Amino acid sequence: MKLGLCLPPFHPPAPVDMALAGANALGVDSLWTFDHLLGIFHPELYPDIGLSEIVPDPDGLFDPFCLAAWAGRSTEAPLGVAVTDGLRRAAPDVARSALSLQHLCRGGFNLGVGSGEAENLLPFGYSFDRPVSRTEEFLAVLRHLLDSGRMPDGPGRLGLPLESDAGRPRVWVAAHRPRMLRLTGRYADGWLPVDVTSPDQYRRLKTTVAGHAAATGRAEPESGLFVFLVLGDSRDRVREMFEAQPMAKLFALWMAPESAWNRYGIENPAGRSERAFIDIIPHELDAARLRDFAPSIPFELIEEYTFLGNPAEVAERLAAFAAAGLEHPVILNLTGMAGGLDEAMARGTEMEELGRAVRAMTTTTVPATAHA
């Protein structure tokens, strides 16, 4: 199985340098970063989260395309953005950026696209209306530009070569629900979900994507998974880390949908949403209420959306996804979120161990189901 790592796109650059050096030592198959204008933690509470020892401002986020260009000269691995959206970026601009980075990065470029998140749109004056319909329009133009160098209509064209020595830029789509899964099969070279909590769910969604690809005469997209990772000596040690840093538990506020909170009989102070991170804007919530609420968040709920424990424990869980068809996990190491600088620095060898285990895994082929 391939291994991708996500570079933290936070100021200052030193942690990014460290992550890049570690990734090169691991010999990863891909490097990515994410495209956020706001971070996921309330700024008033952030000083009480371990990550603040490493990153001083949760909203101090570099532009991902600039970061990819900077990092792409220091590694043979392809760089990627996981993910941007077509609600605040126009397809011709993104296509030009993707082609530019395909040539500027030694290993080429992976372009991840999603349907947008409220926190990156509404506070900055962007519309969040019709996100999936607008994403479909975006992908249609983007695909045409990357395949032909021209707009679907009119004289608009991009003069950059469509290929580098590393090939063509590859489009990945973050999809979880029927319409976006259809768009993945129709337009994407890769599928990169984040909100998948079980191998059975992963297998079902992968089969759907493959069916849509087959129905449009395209090859099945490569199957990825964006993985949030917290390493420790054991699962029990990670539990202790979160109990000692309860504000870090607010990560679940961003990831878990209403149905997950309902299973634990807890009312989510962020409101009722089955789409969780798509709808939630943490900065708009009452900080005092969140501070009181955080200690009550069950560790088991965090575990549903985070791969945590020692390398053997994490590898066992990832192996179940490999058996469901996972080909290319993209791992964001969030150990510092709960453990702070000491835990983050102490887990270098464990990350290497996990990387070796992932690379040794074999992906199980999952047959496609045709879709009209």
Go through the PLM ranges and name each one.
Residues 3-14, 82-92, 166-176, 229-232, ...:
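Active-site mouth loops of central-metabolism enzymes
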Residues 49-80, 141, 347-364:
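Alpha-helix-loop-beta-strand connector modules within alpha/beta enzyme cores
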Residues 128-162, 202-320, 362-372:
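An alpha-helical appendage that flanks or caps ligand/catalytic pockets
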Residues 32-62, 85, 117, 122, ...:
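Glycine-rich, proline-tolerant flexible connector loops at the mouths of alpha/beta enzymes
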Residues 27, 35, 71, 101, ...:
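Conserved, mostly hydrophobic/aromatic
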Residues 12-23, 94-97, 174-183, 311-320:
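Short, acidic/polar
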